[in-house]
């Protein structure tokens, strides 16, 4: 946590969770509690020692002696922050082009979070991240096999970027091949061909899935050598 997760930009929240003045959201980076707050002009982030609610609206302006953490809103409205007091790169410099493949889809229209879920998993955070970036685990999922195993699927490539990031080239998901499902082409994101699927994996453990009709972000927080907190946001 100290040597890796406290040094990088972390996609902690989505701006739709902080859409109005006074809205706040709490979370954690590298074992330290943080708070994001909409002051009416922009979203600010601080270390958090006093607010115990997950989210809400403050009736009075936030007053704190804590120094403001570096904070940016980028890549589909995600709120990024870092515990590093002197980051050497902006968020766009840090992500280094990994989002270019989906930028026109996630930045064209405003998005809104409709689901949040978290889980504590008994595994090393590296193993979880590897599962999100490799292809073989799809063979264990019936839905993935019947809806996605086609020539495009097997032609995909992991495309590497600086700073340890990768993205996975797209393929067409045939949702109608799964019993009870229908084609989702009409629900696809703007500037995205119907039923496409893209994935962006960021070092050290952040994953973004664009499945045509929904955009999901996964963040990991190591809790121990073999325990990890995983948080999911769906837009």
Which ranges hold each PLM region?
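N-terminal pre-ligand scaffold of iron-sulfur
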Residues: 1-49, 71-72
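C-terminal catalytic domain of Rieske-type non-heme iron oxygenases
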Residues: 18-19, 35-43, 69-235
């Amino acid at each position: 946590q100290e040597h890796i997760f406290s040094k990088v930009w972390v996609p902690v929240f989505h701006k739709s969770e902080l859409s109005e003045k006074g809205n706040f959201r709490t979370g954690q980076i590298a074992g330290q509690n943080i708070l994001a707050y909409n002051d009416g002009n922009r979203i600010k982030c601080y270390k958090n020692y006093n607010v115990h609610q997950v989210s809400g609206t403050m009736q009075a302006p936030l007053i704190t002696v804590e120094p403001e953490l570096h904070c940016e809103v980028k890549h589909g409205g995600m709120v990024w922050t870092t515990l590093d007091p002197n980051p050497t790169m902006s968020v766009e410099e840090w992500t280094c082009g990994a989002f270019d493949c989906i930028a026109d889809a996630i930045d064209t229209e405003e998005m809104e979070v409709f689901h949040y879920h978290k889980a504590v998993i008994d595994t090393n955070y590296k193993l979880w991240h590897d599962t999100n970036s490799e292809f073989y685990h799809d063979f264990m999922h019936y839905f993935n096999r019947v809806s996605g195993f086609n020539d495009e699927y097997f032609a995909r490539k992991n495309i590497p970027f600086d700073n340890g990031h990768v993205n996975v080239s797209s393929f067409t998901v045939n949702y109608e091949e799964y019993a009870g499902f229908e084609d989702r082409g009409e629900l696809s994101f703007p500037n995205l061909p119907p039923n496409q699927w893209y994935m962006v994996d960021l070092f050290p453990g952040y994953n973004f899935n664009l499945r045509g009709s929904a955009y999901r972000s996964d963040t990991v927080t190591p809790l121990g050598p073999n325990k990890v907190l995983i948080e999911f946001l769906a837009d």
